[in-house]
Amino acid sequence: MSFVSSKIFAITGGASGIGAATCRLLAKRGAATLCVGDLCSENMKLLEKDIKKINPDTKVHCTVLDVSSSSNVDEWIQDIITTFGDLHGAANIAGIAQGAGLRQAPTILEDDDQQWKKVFQVNLDGVLYSTRAQVRAMKEFSSTNPGDRSIVNVASIASMSHMPDVFAYGTSKAGCAYFTTFEVTLFALGYFSNIMGMLEGITRTPMLPRFVPSAKTQEEVEETYKKEGFSVIEADDVARTIVWLLSEDSRPVFGANINVGACMP
């Protein structure tokens, strides 16, 4: 995993959960700079302290970022290029949940336009805006500073599971997974970067309780999933695969959407 050392990475949704776990592991593996974009600034100072303890040589650049705004994303990536001079890899992890058990069947009648748009603006539009800006930056530097460059888009096992009660979330994640597979044509045509996807399972993060709003405790949330046959994994479990995909160790893999954690079809 030393192949991530001395490199510059951009991580959306990087201040907590899977994003923060990815940042910590990249720092441990010797990344030069971590550019964290997150809508919530609450955990940024804590992340900076954690990274400093893990690797004092890793720089952390935190930005309040709304991935549903293409101009906001473009400005963020341009600021990374202006400040640090390159971009070697990116992980697009930012996303929002949709609570289950809140709608009566047929649930499509109770999913209003605003809810649908909000989920898609973050979970799908945000991935498009981020990937586009990252590819643009990587293309600019590929001729003068060649080398392996990777983008990892985090979708979800919900993209291939039958969960009609949260179909806006599942459909947005299915779009993210398909977008990632489709965009790999950039790699196949001999361009500068590799784009891969992640389908993470039920992961113990601050966002997990939002999927089960009826649960009063974290234990109730996890018990709900266990009754449905899902195991609960840690954010670090997902981060290890993301960092592997960002490293040169994953060079033979491209266009894949890799499942991490248990999945029910």
From Swiss-Prot:
Extent of the signal sequence: 1-20
Catalytic activity: chanoclavine-I + NAD(+) = chanoclavine-I aldehyde + NADH + H(+)
GO terms (BP aspect): indole alkaloid biosynthetic process
SUPFAM superfamilies the UniProt entry points to: NAD(P)-binding Rossmann-fold domains
Pathway: Alkaloid biosynthesis; ergot alkaloid biosynthesis
InterPro entries on file: NAD(P)-bd_dom_sf, SDR_fam
Keyword Lyase included in the entry's annotation: no
Subunit structure: Homotetramer.
UniProt name for this protein: Chanoclavine-I dehydrogenase easD
Organismal lineage: Eukaryota, Fungi, Dikarya, Ascomycota, Pezizomycotina
Gene expressing this chain: easD
